């Protein structure tokens, strides 16, 4: 039997789940059924988080546009309860960036990055060796020929907590979740638009 949905999202990671939640919220706001949004995941929701993700959210980036997007992302993670309707608290350890000193006992490239990030309202400051030693755990070895930069607003999330929040967000959003479901192929109509997805659990129409 073919299942019918308004929208099908393939991939149950953070991005796929966030997309499904957003669409379901829009449908519900317009008087529709949020259950008509289906999220397909070939394994389990957020399964890749513990395998590939350290849970670090940071904004510092050499590309100005990427840094601004990352800053928006960081702010959204801090506001995730209002976006996903699920509680998720980060550890606010910050991050220390370490670079080799140049012949002038500094690092011009990183100093330029510091100024560039400041113009984007991203806190990223050069710190002395002693301050870096104070902030870093003792098992991390550092030396005087290195220069240090502190990003105090970097966040770290426990991947297990993120997965729990993903499940809670999907439940509260009333999204249809199809786990352990592999996408086998797509079917298109005469206009070339995808209208059906063939999965290991059957055909789904959208």
Residue spans for each PLM region:
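Short helix-terminating capping/connector loops at secondary-structure junctions
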Residues: 30-35, 87-91, 178
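Beta1/beta-strand and adjacent pyrophosphate-binding region of the FAD-binding site
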Residues: 2-15, 38
């Amino acid at each position: 039997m073919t299942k019918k949905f308004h929208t099908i999202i393939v991939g149950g990671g953070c991005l796929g789940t966030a997309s499904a939640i957003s669409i379901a919220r829009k449908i519900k706001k317009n008087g529709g059924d949020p259950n008509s949004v289906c999220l397909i995941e070939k394994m389990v929701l957020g399964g890749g988080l513990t395998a590939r993700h350290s849970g670090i959210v940071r904004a510092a980036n050499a590309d100005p546009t990427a840094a601004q997007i990352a800053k928006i992302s960081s702010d959204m993670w801090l506001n995730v309860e209002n976006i996903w309707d699920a509680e998720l608290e980060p550890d606010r350890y910050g991050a220390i960036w370490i670079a080799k000193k140049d012949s002038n006992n500094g690092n011009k490239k990183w100093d330029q990055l510091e100024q560039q990030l400041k113009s984007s309202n991203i806190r990223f400051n050069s710190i002395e060796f002693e301050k870096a030693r104070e902030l870093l755990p003792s098992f991390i070895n550092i030396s005087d020929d290195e220069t240090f930069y502190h990003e105090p607003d970097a966040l770290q999330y426990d991947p297990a907590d993120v997965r729990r929040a993903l499940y809670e967000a999907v439940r509260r959003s009333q999204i249809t979740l199809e786990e352990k479901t592999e996408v086998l192929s797509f079917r298109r109509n005469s206009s070339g638009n995808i209208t059906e997805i063939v999965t290991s659990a059957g055909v789904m129409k959208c």
